[in-house]
């Protein structure tokens, strides 16, 4: 049975691998500097997000992108506001703190950073002037940690709040492609590009072997990135490998019949399988945890079901509820098929 543990268990989508093989014997400068593939990928991304004034840089993975993106826009006496389940707060081993910056979590429980909760953190942190870490940025993820997709209204509300407090806006886009192709999405990437100080387009979790593309509008991060990515151990000597992959992902030659890049096509397939899984599990009587129209789906199960699913399909446990039941996660990837979903549903039916 296929695993539903995460969206990076497989290697890479065939079109991505084909591009790597086709260019394998080419020789290019290192470190993403001046090679033809990185430069073309940068321009393709600028064109796609609708901004020619941004820098496009590459990081090896999400943690590296977050470290450089967050610390490059903050002084060491400043902090970043995020939700309590934000990735930089709970899943990156204190990397922001290790770089001398402070994470300031809110009590938002649904994965979305709200103006009301962010205001509480702001009021507390600024209540004694120079004696506390000063908030200087907000950090959000699209999709959220529990699969939520930001609406344009909600995104604009938190951006308006941040701008009214002169805070920078960083969007973790490890699963940006899933968010953008969700059937419930009304927030285009071009609008994110207009409002965010920086964001990134995740490749690792969307059919690439590795790599994230940071889109940087903030002048401080533009200046800092080349140095921070090296200092923090994230600069690849064979940087052209990142350029080749993102070039293939946004190359017009790989656009589908609907006129969207390969980057979106891969995510759209994963989302479709995830929605099929969600609906099938609900039909079998499994309780969804929250609401997700992206490639991550969460369900409330008994401890016995938790163990059975973990062994059969690799589901991971995210929370233990007060009544002892577990919240487990299923993730679909570019490689997931409808047949894979149906096989897992047949198993789920047997233990319902």
Region locations from a protein language model:
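Conserved PLP-anchoring active-site segment centered on the Schiff-base-forming lysine
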Residues: 72-90, 119
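General beta-strand structural signal in soluble alpha/beta enzymes
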Residues: 3-6, 56-60, 82-83, 140, ...
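Buried hydrophobic positions in well-ordered alpha/beta secondary-structure cores of metabolic enzymes
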Residues: 4, 45, 65, 96, ...
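Catalytic PLP-binding core of fold-type I/II PLP enzymes
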Residues: 150-182
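Conserved C-terminal alpha-helix-loop-beta "cap" of PLP-dependent enzymes
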Residues: 75-77, 275-350
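PLP-dependent aminotransferase-class I/II
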Residues: 100-145, 149-157
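Active-site C-terminal subdomain of aminotransferase-like
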Residues: 134-144, 149, 187-294
């Amino acid at each position: 049975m296929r695993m539903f543990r995460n969206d990076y268990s497989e290697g890479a989508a065939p079109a991505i691998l084909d591009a790597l093989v086709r260019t394998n014997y080419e020789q290019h400068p290192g470190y993403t500097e001046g090679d033809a593939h990185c430069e073309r990928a940068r321009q393709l991304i600028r064109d796609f997000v609708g901004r020619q004034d941004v820098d496009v840089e590459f990081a090896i993975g999400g943690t590296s992108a977050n470290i450089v993106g967050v610390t490059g826009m903050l002084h060491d006496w400043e902090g970043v506001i995020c939700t309590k389940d934000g990735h930089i707060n709970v899943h990156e081993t204190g990397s922001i703190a290790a770089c001398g910056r402070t994470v300031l979590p809110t009590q938002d429980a649904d994965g979305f950073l709200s103006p009301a909760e962010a205001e509480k953190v702001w009021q507390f942190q600024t209540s004694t002037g120079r004696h506390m870490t000063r908030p200087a940025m907000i950090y959000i993820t699209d999709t959220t940690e529990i699969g939520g997709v930001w609406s344009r209204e909600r995104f604009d509300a938190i951006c308006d709040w941040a701008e009214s407090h002169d805070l920078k806006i960083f969007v973790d886009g490890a699963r940006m492609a899933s968010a953008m192709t969700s059937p419930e999405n009304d927030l285009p990437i071009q609008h994110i590009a207009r409002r965010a100080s920086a964001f990134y387009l995740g490749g690792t979790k969307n059919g690439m072997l590795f790599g994230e593309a940071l889109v940087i509008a903030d002048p401080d991060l533009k200046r800092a990135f080349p140095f921070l990515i090296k200092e923090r151990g994230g600069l690849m000597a064979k940087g052209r490998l990142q350029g080749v992959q993102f070039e293939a992902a946004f190359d017009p030659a790989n656009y589908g019949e609907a006129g969207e890049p390969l980057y979106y096509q891969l995510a759209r397939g994963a989302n479709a399988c995830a929605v099929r899984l969600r609906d099938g599990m609900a039909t079998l009587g499994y309780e969804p945890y929250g609401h997700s129209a992206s490639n991550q789906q969460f369900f409330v199960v008994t401890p016995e079901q938790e163990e059975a699913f973990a062994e059969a399909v690799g589901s991971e446990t995210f929370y233990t509820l007060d009544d002892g039941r577990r919240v487990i996660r299923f993730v679909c990837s570019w490689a997931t098929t409808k047949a894979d979903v149906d096989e897992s549903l047949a198993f789920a039916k047997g233990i319902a």
